[in-house]
Amino acid sequence: MEAIKKKMQAMKLEKDNAIDRAEIAEQKARDANLRAEKSEEEVRALQKKIQQIENELDQVQEQLSAANTKLEEKEKALQTAEGDVAALNRRIQLIEEDLERSEERLKIATAKLEEASQSADESERMRKMLEHRSITDEERMDGLENQLKEARMMAEDADRKYDEVARKLAMVEADLERAEERAETGESKIVELEEELRVVGNNLKSLEVSEEKAQQREEAYEQQIRIMTAKLKEAEARAEFAERSVQKLQKEVDRLEDELVHEKEKYKSISDELDQTFAELTGY
């Protein structure tokens, strides 16, 4: 009887232990199920986040493609502006050459005027000394008149040349205004590209990439942005250089205009002297 009691107690103790182990196993199973459900939720959330990141990266890629297109357009505009600046330089060189030739003709006309004046003085002295030699005096007067006419024709030709130079300068000024407008348009496009790049950079910084492939793609896009930023800085520098070149050309045009005014005044003075000399000669 005592043995049966002991056996029953042992069986009861074993039953209690089994119940405890079963409860522990059930608790572990519940914990495992909770962890499994949590892991599944995390996996679904991670997959959703990766899909969202891929969508955002696709949008960023489209924005980068559009930015590359705008950058190419900007570079083409800058190349056009540089070509215009080179054409302006060539035109100014031609104007300077015309001005040098006109100055040479002015020197010739001035020399002939001096020669005519000297001849007129000599003619006056000869007229007083040789009043009875009218035929000789008339021939000399005719020669002086011909020289004066030739000098006047050269002065008129020089005036026409300077009018042509003035017309060319007006064309240069119009070209300069168009170049300045293109430079201003290029600057506004650069500002727009910088703003777009800033937005792209902020979007990339806000992405929380948890998958290695997405991280690699983000790094590649950031490298493209750095390259585009460097290209934009280079384009800005080229635009600034083009603007400085236009300003320099404008100063050169102003200088040439001043020289034109000065040369026209010299021509007017020579023309007045020719008219006065001719009047004095015809008065005798």
From Swiss-Prot:
Known InterPro entries for this protein? Tropomyosin (IPR000533)
Keyword Coiled coil part of the UniProt annotation = yes
> Domain of life, per the record?
Eukaryota
List keywords of the entry alphabetically. Allergen, Coiled coil, Repeat
Point out the coiled-coil segments of this chain.
Answer: 1-284
Pfam family of the protein (one): Tropomyosin
The record's comment about this protein's domains reads: The molecule is in a coiled coil structure that is formed by 2 polypeptide chains. The sequence exhibits a prominent seven-residues periodicity.
| Described purpose of this protein according to its UniProt entry | Tropomyosin, in association with the troponin complex, plays a central role in the calcium dependent regulation of muscle contraction.
Say which family it is in: Belongs to the tropomyosin family.
- What does the annotation say about its assembly with partners? Homodimer.
User: What's the name of the protein?
Assistant: Tropomyosin
What organism is recorded for this protein?
Dermatophagoides farinae
Per the UniProt record, the lineage of the source organism begins with: Eukaryota, Metazoa, Ecdysozoa, Arthropoda, Chelicerata
